[in-house]
């Protein structure tokens, strides 16, 4: 999986086929997660000028694609998140739209969320070493510090806040990287979270 805690939700593919489709320069593969506002798919870049690369594609559910307020906030937040470039935060590559399908292309992470690693160890009667936990926490703190200090082109703070820094949103890759995931969720618990200009709020 490549993005945070994705809860089970009804499939939206009955009316719109996504698997096998081409969204922009991406060929969409299998679905790897689904949440309340979007589903996530494994995809790869295509085209003669593109080096083949696997990415995670977050596709907004069809019923939300028709909500003007949601789409406006989604675009604003995506455009801010594209600016974020830090080794301890998942990289958002681009926001795109193909016909009526709105999507976000992100770095694909091959690994497991920290919550799953901890639960796997617990089932085996083990636990994460305290030194390792401290190291993981330091990497998360570095990512958060960068996000909190990020500014726009006028050097004004963007006030990017995660608000759900939890084990399911800390991803550890098989290469030993530590990545914060699931920034910028604007819709939660069936409501629109109001944001002010230049401010992104995470999950509540």
Each language-model region and where it sits:
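AlphaC helix of the eukaryotic protein kinase fold
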Residues: 61-83
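Protein kinase catalytic-loop region centered on the HRD/HxD motif
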Residues: 142-160
């Amino acid at each position: 999986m490549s993005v945070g805690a994705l809860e089970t939700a009804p499939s939206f593919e009955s009316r719109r086929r996504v698997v096998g489709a081409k969204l922009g320069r991406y060929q969409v593969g299998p679905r790897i997660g689904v949440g309340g506002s979007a589903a996530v798919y494994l995809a790869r870049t295509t085209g003669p000028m593109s080096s083949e690369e696997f990415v995670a594609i977050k596709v907004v559910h069809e019923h939300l694609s028709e909500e003007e307020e949601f789409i406006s906030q989604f675009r604003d937040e995506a455009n801010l998140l594209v600016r974020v470039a830090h080794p301890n935060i998942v990289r958002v590559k681009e926001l795109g739209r193909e016909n009526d399908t709105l999507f976000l292309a992100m770095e694909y992470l091959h690994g497991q969320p920290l919550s799953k690693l901890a639960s796997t160890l617990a089932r085996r009667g083990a636990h994460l070493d305290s030194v390792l936990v401290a190291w993981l926490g330091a990497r998360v703190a570095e990512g958060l510090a960068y996000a909190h200090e990020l500014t726009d082109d006028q050097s004004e703070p963007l006030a990017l806040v995660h608000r759900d820094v939890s084990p399911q949103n800390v991803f550890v890759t098989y290469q030993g990287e530590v990545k914060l995931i699931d920034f910028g969720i604007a819709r939660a618990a069936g409501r629109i979270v109001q944001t002010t200009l230049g401010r992104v709020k995470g999950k509540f």
